[in-house]
Amino acid sequence: AGFDSWKAVTSAMAECGNVTSTLDQDFKDVQADAFAVNPSLYQIGGVNNSAFSILVNAGTIRPLDDLVAKYGSHLKPSQLIKVNGQILAIAMQVNNQHLMYREDIFKDLGLAEPKTHADMLAAAKFMQSYNIVDYPIGGTYKAGWNLGEEFVNNYLGNGGEFFGEGNAPSINNATGVATLNTMKALTEYMDPEYLVGDSTYVQQQFQQGKIAMATLWGTRAAAMDNAEESTVVGKVKMASAPMGTSRAAATNWWDGIVLASNMTDEQADTAFRVVMEGIDTEMVLANNDAAVWLVDGYVAGSAAQGALDTATNGAAPYPSSLAGMGAMHSALGNGVGAFLTGEKDAATALADIEAAYIIAATESGLM
């Protein structure tokens, strides 16, 4: 289930011997508990901005300054993720969701590259009458984290703010309603089972020629040209995420590596050396297009173009530093589906999401 860059990194780590890796899309849910055990169930953890914040707040990851001084003099400043002056993670790549589309189909139909969601909808409507693909659009709308992330991307793209004074929620507004309406409009051109669609599901829809466009993680781009599993090699173009009213409707992320605090210094020393083997230049040269790497040796190719264009078009960083964001993301992931399926209208869905957030935020002391 892991995306290609993590497969590359963990394979490089395995060359050290005595290294076992678990690749799980739901890693964030198990990692916090695994790191809290003493000794930790894992010594090395793969993280993104959001998962990193959870571990920092839990106090279960080890400062890396001593190990960076000993083994990491080659690391770039952009790779050293610091909190209060201490290095707590080593970043290896940047990531965002951006538009991927079947360039061959768009050319055959005389359609221009979509720049907005309205462009996507117009292209999908036109395409549908030709019956070229099963569904014109794919979407990572799986109920839970993925669906919450779709709202976050589009709400920020429209200039939305999640919180007011004292961490109070602030999504039940015109921007929130517009965001929901855009999301629902896109579902009309998706597989009706879109609420089970995670990144792997949408990647496979693309590879099997079932969809013509989707906003998908940049780390999935290289898989489109993997001849062993893709029927659309050379046909999927990478482009910027659709523009919202304020900026590209996506969030910028980093992925990297942390060490658990609940292990011995000797184990940490060994684990860090394994990490350095996993994210070295040799690995990048062998897997250049698997990610937008922060590691020396990386050369940006066509697979990275969409991620780079999305960043250029102003995509906001995922707001993981906001204290209430974890609870907000969870409430969104659990609550947006009721609007998409017609169970609730937009205002009711947003009010209920805010209410769920308030309960969680009150219980945790944020409000």
What would you call each of these model-derived segments?
Residues K107, T312-M367:
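Conserved C-terminal helix/tail region of periplasmic/extracytoplasmic solute-binding proteins
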Residues L88-I90, Q97, L121-A168, I211:
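Extracytoplasmic/periplasmic solute-binding protein
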Residues R62-K76, N131, P136-G144, N158-T179, ...:
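Short, solvent-exposed loop/beta-turn-alpha elements that line the ligand-binding surface or hinge
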Residues I87, D108-L109, V177, E188, ...:
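Extracytoplasmic/periplasmic substrate-recognition and gating elements
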Residues A32-A36, S40-Q43, Y71-F106, Y135, ...:
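A structural signal for short loop-to-beta-strand junctions that line the ligand-binding cleft
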Residues A1-I54, E113, L195, T245, ...:
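Conserved N-terminal structural module of periplasmic/extracytoplasmic solute-binding proteins
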Residues A124-F126, G166-L195:
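Glycine-centered hinge/linker elements that transmit conformational signals in sensory
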Residues K28, N48-Q97, A112, L121, ...:
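Hinge/lid segment of periplasmic solute-binding proteins
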